[in-house]
Amino acid sequence: MSPPSHFDFIEARDKFTVATKNAVDTRNCKPLTTAFSHLPGNETEKKATLDQALRGVLEEQIVNQKVNVDDFLSLIYISIDGVTEGICSATTPFLLLGDVLDCLPLDQCDKIFSFVEENVSTWKSNTFYSAGKNYLLRMCNDLLRRLSKSQNTVFCGRIQLFLARLFPLSEKSGLNLQSQFNLDNITVFNKNEQDSTLGQQHTEVKEEGMDVEEGEMGDEDAPAPSSIPIDYNLYRKFWTLQDYFRNPVQCYDKFSWMTFIKYSDEALAVFKSFKLDDMQASKKKLEEMRTSSGDHVYFAKFLTSEKLMDLQLSDSNFRRHILLQYLILFQYLKGQVKFKSSSCVLNDDQSLWIEDTTKLVYQLLKEIPPDGDKFGSMVEHILNTEENWNSWKNEGCPSFVKERPAETKPIRPSRKRQAPEDFLGKGPDRKILMGNDELTRLWNLNPDNMEACKSENREFMPSLEDFFEEAIEQADPANMVEDEYKVVRNSNYGWRALRLLSRRSPHFFQPTNQQFKSLADYLENMVIKLAKELPKDIPSEEIKTGEEDDDENGDNLLKDSNDSPSIQSKAVTNSQMDEIAAKLGSQWKTLADHLEMSDKEIRVIESDSEDVDLQAKMLLVAWQDREGSQATMESLVTALNAAGFNNIADNLSET
């Protein structure tokens, strides 16, 4: 018996190289299969050698620049057939594709990628998908890095569509599981007012352009719409809104939200004041616009030149883009997102503003020609169905493919054996024997254990009258019990009293504006309320409170009552803030120091508006938002007196 022949890598590679070139010329994989079967060695060695030979032939083709793209594709087709025949590795076609795309210029890469798109069904087959999906993803990402987002927009879109067709919807690599934003999408615009040309050219353009437009208009055409007055402030505020659309989390910050509201109101006011009704005045003009425009052109990035601002605001597509951004932002702010921070919550005022503004945005969308009503209804329908997508993302993006349930044989119900007599006992009573006389007696006291637990004999919670009887007696000023000896000062008693009040008294759940420094003060207040409601047969004289006899008892806690409103609990109304802001004027910074406003907050207020009255109003609003329920009339009066505004404080106290 002859020994097995030795496998020579160099010789095998040379033979595979010759066979590969013949296969490329004949467009047939048969020379490779023949060479593979005649060479000695195991299958793994021959596969690795053939993979190396294929990449070597590709290298020669790339170095020889006379070879066209079809020759590259022929070699890749041969490798695909080789994988199908089982003579080369499943990753070889993807390695060849990656080498070709890395070495060719972009114009030829376009043709190679067309081949990749056409064979998406091949890549998704069981033979290639698991072995090549990571290679294809890496290849597409490398290609996207080489392409320009502005000049190669179509090519970039084709790559994204290919990846969407290749991977299933639940593929983790293509999902934004943590709901992250593209923070690199920064809108660049002129932020220096000194470099602005809006104020210099506005009057000249208006005077020179008006005569030309009027002279060119025909008798049948509608009158030209008036130009929208644009200054640098409107330009800056309008494009600043893009930063909020880019990163919606900013809206949860108080001062950023105030800025967003102000800028949005001004931008939407421009859309509302200057409508595009004139575009529908003439059917002839509309038809000319449709025929002359040709194919629809999509711009992936806004143009922020100051000279284009007037034209952009008069363009229906531009308005729709901006208004649609508002609706998407509002849906994110109102929606339930799994990865939102616990602090990202809207208050009632923010929710109300979003609701009103959403209605305004839909109204403006329906007023934009052409087909405004149809477009608005379509957008509303799409955003409603988007809720299903949000729910799917919150659930971790489970697969839409339902797995077949495993076929299980029906389980036979097991027979229950009867309890033995030594456990249930004998006779009509059939007591349960626990193995001990005392345990047996306790277990069989009642046939139904649940009913036994509900018995009145097991009710150990005392009544309010019995538990608070001693505390009510001590609260009577006539008994002259010092505070340190009262039972409400006992922490153990206070803990049990709170538990009893939560189970038996409705006062425990009623909100109160009165502030208590300790648990004992709170319990004394509750004792007074209970004394008025409980029966009068308690062995004590009628309870006297500090309200009835101020001279005998100076107990301030019993004197206070929550039944009547006072200046301590009054909140500052919006009209009062307007009146105070008008009186403060430019001196609002003096009050800001006594309201403990930081320098950063003051700078934000100054940058948002140049009107001193509005700045004073924003100061009071920011203080009220920060303090919440503590922003009372008393606190504001104290701050006004400390700042030296005694006249304003006196007028506020009188109201």
From Swiss-Prot:
It is found in: Nucleus; Nucleus, Nucleoplasm; Nucleus matrix; Cytoplasm, Cytosol. The keyword Translocase does not apply. It holds the Pfam family Death. Keywords: Apoptosis, Cytoplasm, DNA-binding, mRNA processing, mRNA splicing, mRNA transport, Nucleus, RNA-binding, Transcription, Transcription regulation, Transport. Expressed in the developing neuromast. Its main location: nucleus. Residues 403-427, 539-574 are annotated as: Disordered. Residues 563-574 have a biased composition (Polar residues). InterPro entries: DEATH-like_dom_sf, Death_dom, THO_THOC1. GO terms for cellular component: cytosol; nuclear matrix; nucleoplasm; THO complex part of transcription export complex. Disruption phenotype: Knockdown animals exhibit an impaired startle response, suggesting hearing dysfunction. They show greatly reduced hair cell numbers. A motif (Nuclear localization signal) lies at residues 415-431. Residues 418-427 have a biased composition (Basic and acidic residues). One of its GO terms (biological process) is apoptotic process. GO terms for molecular function: DNA binding; RNA binding. Residues 573-655 form the Death domain. Component of the THO subcomplex of the TREX complex which is thought to couple mRNA transcription, processing and nuclear export, and which specifically associates with spliced mRNA and not with unspliced pre-mRNA. Required for efficient export of polyadenylated RNA. The THOC1-THOC2-THOC3 core complex alone is sufficient to bind export factor NXF1-NXT1 and promote ATPase activity of DDX39B. Participates in an apoptotic pathway which is characterized by activation of caspase-6, increases in the expression of BAK1 and BCL2L1 and activation of NF-kappa-B. This pathway does not require p53/TP53, nor does the presence of p53/TP53 affect the efficiency of cell killing. Activates a G2/M cell cycle checkpoint prior to the onset of apoptosis. Apoptosis is inhibited by association with RB1. Essential for early embryonic development. Required for normal gene expression during postnatal testis development. Component of the THO complex. An intact death domain is needed for apoptosis. This is THO complex subunit 1. The gene is thoc1.
